[in-house]
């Protein structure tokens, strides 16, 4: 079994919830290796294979009316809701902040504050977005979300090569150690004042002196609480700290119409438009490329839940190829690209 992370490379709740629920109804999805498009995995989706869904979104509104389907089927899930202080120069595809705050509150009222994580992420600096600007907006958002979440996750902008040109155009500057200390020394205590704990995501810096904990991309303690069982944890150095799982869920580059300037998963607005236009929620594939033969491997899923009676809480999740004896190879002519 597995934890499905949906998704850090696109916003499924905002744009692809119809597609998601159809995949759930069909009981499987395909995952294409982005580095090797000929490698495709078939992931089974049912109560026997899925431990939990983790949704990453900036606007869950389009999905909210259908969450009862997940409740009825008995799937544990929670949301990571990114709500930042930036304008249309940085986040051109988002609704107004007041509308997003309202959506956040509605989602929290439905699920409970422990199942809606607020992400103030990434923190970036420019002539328009100064430290003082962040002080003002972080305080305002803390006040607006007080009682609707217990956790705020922050991270500082990583200047990936593919986003540098975009960030240079809005005059984003490098974050210094002094900047981090100044921001952290305000954010930690301010969030506490509103009943929240601040955690970092994939940050090497130790900010514990400012009441900020080192966090994880996916919260094992929260999931353990949802499942009512301890999890088996393992360290993953790929994100500079502790992670819960290797993300092998719904993911594809150039598919998010939010078009946030800092997003590493979008590097061609034209491709985003093309893929959005070609998208058909009725197809298991995400978008349609030219016809070609694909080699599909059915993946074995290993649960992150500790066996009953196992007192350990060392947490891991692996997606590994099945042994030759148990591996199923399927060939298909597809009229759609797989995630």
Name each model-derived stretch:
Residues 9-11, 58, 82-86, 121-123, ...:
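Active-site beta-loop-alpha junctions enriched in small/polar residues
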Residues 99-166, 185-202:
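Conserved C-terminal portion of the radical SAM core fold
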Residues 149-253:
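Catalytic cores of enzyme domains
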Residues 329:
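Cationic, low-complexity basic patches in intrinsically disordered or flexible, solvent-exposed regions
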Residues 86-94, 122-132, 167-175:
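Surface-exposed cleft-lining segments at the edges of enzyme active sites
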Residues 248-268:
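Local cysteine-cluster metal-coordination motifs and their immediate loop/turn environment
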Residues 1-90, 97, 102-113, 269-326, ...:
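Conserved Radical SAM active-site core
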């Amino acid at each position: 079994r597995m934890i499905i992370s949906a998704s850090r490379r696109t916003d499924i709740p905002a744009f692809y919830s119809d597609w998601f629920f159809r995949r759930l109804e069909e009981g499987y999805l395909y995952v294409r290796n982005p580095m090797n498009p000929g490698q495709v995995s078939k992931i089974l989706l049912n109560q026997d294979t899925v431990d939990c869904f983790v949704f990453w979104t900036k606007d869950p509104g389009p999905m909210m009316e259908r969450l009862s389907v997940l409740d009825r089927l008995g799937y544990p899930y929670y949301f990571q809701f990114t709500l930042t202080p930036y304008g249309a120069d940085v986040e051109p595809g988002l609704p107004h902040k007041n509308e997003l705050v309202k959506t956040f509150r509605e989602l929290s009222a439905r699920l409970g504050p422990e199942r809606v994580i607020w992400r103030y992420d990434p923190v970036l600096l420019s002539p328009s977005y100064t430290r003082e600007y962040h002080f003002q907006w972080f305080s305002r958002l803390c006040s607006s979300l007080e009682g609707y979440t217990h956790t705020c996750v922050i991270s500082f902008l990583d200047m990936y090569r593919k986003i540098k040109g975009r960030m240079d155009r809005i005059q984003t500057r490098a974050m210094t150690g002094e900047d981090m200390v100044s921001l952290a020394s305000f954010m930690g205590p301010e969030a506490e004042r509103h009943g929240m704990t601040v955690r970092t995501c994939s940050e090497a810096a130790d900010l514990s002196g400012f009441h900020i904990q080192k966090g994880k991309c996916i919260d094992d303690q929260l999931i353990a609480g949802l499942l009512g069982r301890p999890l088996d944890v393992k360290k993953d150095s790929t994100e500079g700290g502790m992670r819960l799982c290797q993300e092998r869920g719904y993911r594809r580059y150039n598919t998010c119409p939010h078009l946030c300037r800092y997003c590493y998963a979008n590097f061609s607005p034209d491709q985003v438009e093309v893929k959005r236009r070609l998208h058909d929620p009725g197809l298991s594939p995400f978008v349609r490329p030219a016809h070609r033969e694909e080699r599909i491997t059915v993946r074995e899923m290993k649960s992150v839940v500790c066996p009953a009676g196992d007192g350990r809480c060392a947490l891991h999740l692996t997606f590994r190829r099945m042994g030759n004896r148990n591996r199923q190879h399927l060939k298909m002519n597809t009229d759609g690209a797989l995630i």
